[in-house]
């Protein structure tokens, strides 16, 4: 089980990403667009660097929705491989069956 501080940090980052997503996307579009003049591009880079570091999507980590485990997360279910196996064997995941061939 992940520490509560890690889960709260992740939640704070998710909020920042959602809040700054439009602004960040617009600035990145200005920076990467080939027709943007140099002064506007420099200004966009400067404004982009002033945004909060945690507002970038790459700072997010996929975590198990139940216990917050950071590794081995199956994104389709939002569960770690360990939790997925436990729940699947108990029949708690609809439509999931153990493979047999």
Curated annotation (Swiss-Prot):
GO terms for cellular component: small ribosomal subunit. It comes from the Bacteria. Transmembrane segments: none annotated. The keyword Ion transport does not apply. Pfam families: Ribosomal_S14. GO terms for biological process: translation. Keywords: Ribonucleoprotein, Ribosomal protein, RNA-binding, rRNA-binding. One of its GO terms (molecular function) is rRNA binding. Belongs to the universal ribosomal protein uS14 family. Part of the 30S ribosomal subunit. Contacts proteins S3 and S10. Binds 16S rRNA, required for the assembly of 30S particles and may also be responsible for determining the conformation of the 16S rRNA at the A site. This is Small ribosomal subunit protein uS14A.
